[in-house]
Amino acid sequence: GSKANNDGVLDMAKKSIVLLKNDKNLLPLKKSGQKIALIGALANDKNSPLGSWRLAADDNSAVSVLEGMQQYKDNKLTYEKGADLTIEKATFLNELVFNTTDRSGFDAAKKVAANADVVVMVLGENGFQTGEARSRTNLDLPGLQQELLEEIYKVNPNIVLVLNNGRPLALPWAAKNIPTIVE
């Protein structure tokens, strides 16, 4: 696309972000002097933000949350995946198989969370989960994400939950316990 089109899309994306709650005033993040743990496979995903309804977007052409947060160099940012969302690489044609067993990254994620002032967790759906013929039987966080969220909360409750999803999600535990949620 042209620069004008790209600028317009960026403006729409910025305006589509909704602050659902900010009970501890964790947002806005400080521009300097803050230790931030960034956790979640979707935080380093350049494809899912494009969604499955994109027409001509190049794969992996979005700016990931990790890349965006790295722009603020006066904070100490540490990233840990915590757990893979899917077992195999997701594509439009593949059936998505979610990771429900590999918790090997939980300890590293808990360690960085325990040493942070604030934890930003990017959770939700893979971009290829929504779209034609992509119905779900429940609206919970897929894979191990709910378990990861609860484990991180035990070591640091100062969590900003950033949701990446193409449909409503059922998040009763997060709504009750997580102080800041952005969608």
Where are these regions (language model features)?
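C-terminal non-catalytic regions of proteins with extracellular/luminal or membrane-system context
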Residues: 3, 7-183
